[in-house]
């Protein structure tokens, strides 16, 4: 933002001229954040602009209009999800950006209020997620909803039932609403983006966007796979809990089975308040979840009620927002890389700087539109921060330091690897190379084909694939099975033992069950789990190739998006040719039930099994691997086709549905005993 006149210096005419574009800009940013889960600016940019709007309207109250962002909460609930009306509005929160502003807020609250306010505040970490309401009747979860515009939110009941930290049934028959924050842990966010990138899908900008997009899914199975978590922090009807302070309310919620952030603290002085903020300003990078500030609440709940709310925010709480940690550096180059699906992504290469505990020299520029909107040029000095405390990102260009001979960066129109024209597909912001013979895509595809979850060819990594490609030894995955020892001897640092091990690994991969092949082919939207489901259902690649989109979509846990993608892939004549070549070199095309004894096969082969709840004697992954190895198909949802549900601790809606459908249910002890008997 260019240098602006101080609000105190504005004339009414100047204020009026500034207000309209400022409000429109804030509405646009608000819609991106609340409705599209895809903000184009960082929180602090929005916060500063919003703060200026507040100050102008406070100075000229007659210029306030009903649709100003200061008069509304959040954004509209604009999705295909059902709408929920909040009986008690879910308000926004006021914020301050310095310790001085926070001290001033407290002083005004204590001195100017008709209500006596003691220096008795509960401090809580401000979790970077989205607000969530949970309604219980007689102790049972009956509704989950997002904040939306504060009055009307979205019904996400079935989705919240998939979140492990949310109890389905309370230990007391309470009929109450509980509020909190839904978030995505940092580790889950990184893994989700790695998965999406591997499958050619756009990655999320930060954990908050990922959490919002995951919670607002139409399909609860998608939400379940995203590893969301929650921290609850508020009960509108606190008297029903028998508590008198915010700290007591948090402990009561913990006793009821909710996840409550343990890092809250009651403070009684400005020194204690400052110490807490300074402590978590330093610790925030080490936390397994994102925080973007500290929330200060009047600890006494009766005082909270007496203070009440403005039209938009409570008077009894305020958020202290962390200043963004930024470092200035210089952009030296912009590299363009081609992914397995042809997506061409720009990356800024910069002078190394220390940022949030790590050395950073590269930052993704996401897509060409982002690069153009930010007007990033070679030689520019830029401010760098970590989005969601994780991903290095350029905040802005420091225009004053731009070289005099600077020129706008020209986005390439041809693929940096093969020279083919780059295109936008289906209104995507990404640029794609659609040349099926693009070397970069083929090499990425070869690496994916050989990866552990695909054909599992040990020893065949990207560097060796690069050498094989450069020597002209492979042009597609079928060529891997035509490699001979004499060819490999020409590669540097390749001895007889290495060659023998690699050829053995390649030969062994011929005999994989076909779900590994399906995943290895790199079909859009087909991860390892989907490949397993398709293989178990159709039994062979040929049968899957012959199926239409509707038939594939009807498979349990698949759906129309995946069904269309798979059917479209197998309609391609080049794919038919590749499958024929793979058959020619002896690659198995059938689903192979694991080699087991007659007793084992009778017990597990072909069974559809669902795992639910927390397992204590093994991880869910270990249980799934054991079952799959014995021919069982492990699915994510309960249906009439399910043969067995294995229920761990705190099993919820899946257990209820299985019991309703009359499906056999085992607890973990029985499953553990069955494993011991077979092993």
From Swiss-Prot:
EC numbers, comma separated: 6.5.1.2
Binding site for NAD(+): 43-47, 92-93, 124, 147, 181, 297, 321
Binding site for Zn(2+): 415, 418, 433, 438
InterPro entries per UniProt: BRCT_dom, BRCT_dom_sf, DisA/LigA_HHH, DNA_ligase, DNA_ligase_AS, DNA_ligase_CS, DNAligase_adenylation, DNAligase_N
Catalytic activity: NAD(+) + (deoxyribonucleotide)n-3'-hydroxyl + 5'-phospho-(deoxyribonucleotide)m = (deoxyribonucleotide)n+m + AMP + beta-nicotinamide D-nucleotide
Domain BRCT: 599-679
Transmembrane segments: none
Keywords from the named record: DNA damage, DNA repair, DNA replication, Ligase, Magnesium, Manganese, Metal-binding, NAD, Zinc
SMART domains: BRCT, LIGANc
GO terms for MF: DNA ligase (NAD+) activity; metal ion binding
One Pfam family hit: DNA_ligase_aden
Cofactor: Mg(2+); Mn(2+)
Coiled coil: none
GO biological process: DNA repair; DNA replication
Family to which this protein belongs: Belongs to the NAD-dependent DNA ligase family. LigA subfamily.
HAMAP family given in the database record: DNA_ligase_A
Protein name (Swiss-Prot/TrEMBL): DNA ligase
Species in which this protein is naturally found: Limosilactobacillus fermentum (strain NBRC 3956 / LMG 18251)
């Amino acid at each position: 933002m260019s240098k602006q006149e101080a609000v105190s210096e504005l004339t009414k005419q100047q204020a009026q001229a500034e207000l309209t574009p400022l409000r429109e800009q804030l509405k646009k940013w608000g819609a991106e954040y609340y409705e599209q889960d895809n903000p184009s600016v960082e929180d602090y940019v929005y916060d500063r602009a919003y703060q200026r709007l507040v100050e102008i309207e406070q100075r000229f109250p007659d210029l306030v209009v009903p649709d100003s962002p200061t008069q509304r909460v959040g954004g509209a609930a604009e999705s295909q999800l059902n709408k929920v009306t909040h009986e008690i509005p879910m308000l926004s929160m006021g914020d301050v950006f310095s310790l001085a502003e926070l001290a001033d807020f407290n002083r005004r609250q204590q001195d100017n209020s008709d209500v006596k306010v003691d220096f008795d505040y509960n401090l809580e970490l401000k979790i970077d997620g989205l607000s969530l309401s949970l309604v219980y009747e007689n102790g049972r979860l009956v509704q989950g909803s997002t904040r939306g515009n504060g009055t009307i939110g979205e019904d996400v009941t079935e989705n919240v039932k998939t979140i492990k930290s949310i109890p389905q049934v309370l230990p007391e028959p309470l009929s109450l609403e509980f509020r909190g924050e839904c978030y995505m842990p940092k580790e889950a966010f990184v893994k989700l983006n790695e998965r999406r990138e591997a499958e050619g899908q756009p990655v999320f900008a930060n954990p908050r966007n990922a959490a919002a997009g995951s919670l607002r899914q139409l399909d609860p199975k998608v939400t379940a796979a995203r590893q969301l978590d929650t921290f609850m922090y508020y009960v509108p009807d606190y008297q029903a809990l028998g508590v008198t302070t915010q700290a007591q309310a948090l402990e009561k919620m913990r006793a009821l089975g909710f996840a409550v952030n343990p890092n809250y603290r009651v403070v009684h002085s400005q020194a204690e308040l400052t110490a807490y903020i300074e402590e978590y300003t330093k610790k925030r990078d080490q936390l397994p979840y994102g925080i973007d500030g500290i929330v200060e609440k009047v600890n006494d709940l009766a005082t909270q009620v007496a203070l009440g709310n403005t039209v938009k925010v409570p008077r009894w709480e305020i958020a202290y927002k962390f200043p963004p940690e930024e470092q200035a550096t210089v952009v030296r180059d912009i590299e363009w890389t081609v992914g397995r699906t042809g997506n061409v992504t720009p990356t800024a290469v910069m002078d190394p700087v220390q940022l949030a505990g790590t050395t950073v020299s590269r930052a993704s520029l996401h897509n060409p539109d982002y690069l153009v909107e930010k007007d990033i040029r070679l030689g520019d000095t830029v401010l760098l921060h970590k989005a969601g405390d994780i991903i290095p990102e350029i905040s802005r260009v420091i225009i004053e330091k731009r070289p005099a001979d600077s020129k706008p960066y020209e986005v390439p129109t041809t693929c940096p690897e093969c020279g083919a024209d780059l295109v936008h597909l289906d209104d995507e912001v990404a640029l794609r190379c659609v040349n099926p013979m693009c070397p970069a895509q083929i090499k990425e595809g070869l690496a994916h084909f050989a990866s552990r979850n695909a054909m599992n060819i040990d020893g065949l990594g990207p560097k060796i694939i690069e050498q094989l490609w450069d020597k002209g030894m492979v042009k597609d995955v079928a060529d891997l099975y035509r490699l001979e020892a004499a060819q490999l001897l020409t590669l540097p640092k390749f001895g007889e033992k290495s060659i023998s091990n690699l050829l053995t690994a390649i030969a062994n991969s011929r005999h994989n069950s076909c779900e590994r092949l399906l995943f290895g082919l790199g079909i859009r939207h087909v991860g390892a789990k989907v490949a397993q489901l398709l293989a178990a259902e159709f039994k062979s690649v040929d049968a899957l190739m012959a199926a239409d989109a509707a038939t594939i979509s009807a498979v349990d846990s698949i759906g129309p998006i995946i069904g269309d993608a798979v059917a479209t892939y197998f309609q391609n004549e080049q794919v038919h040719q590749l499958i024929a070549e793979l058959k020619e070199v002896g690659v198995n095309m059938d689903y192979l039930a694991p080699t087991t004894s007659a007793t084992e096969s009778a017990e597990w082969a072909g069974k559809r099994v669902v795992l639910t709840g927390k397992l204590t004697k093994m991880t869910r992954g270990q249980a799934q691997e054991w079952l799959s190895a014995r021919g069982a198909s492990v699915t994510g949802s309960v249906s009439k086709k399910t043969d067995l549900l294995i229920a761990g601790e705190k099993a919820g809606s899946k257990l209820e549905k299985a019991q309703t459908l009359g499906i056999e249910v085992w607890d973990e002890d029985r499953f553990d005993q069955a494993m011991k008997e077979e092993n």
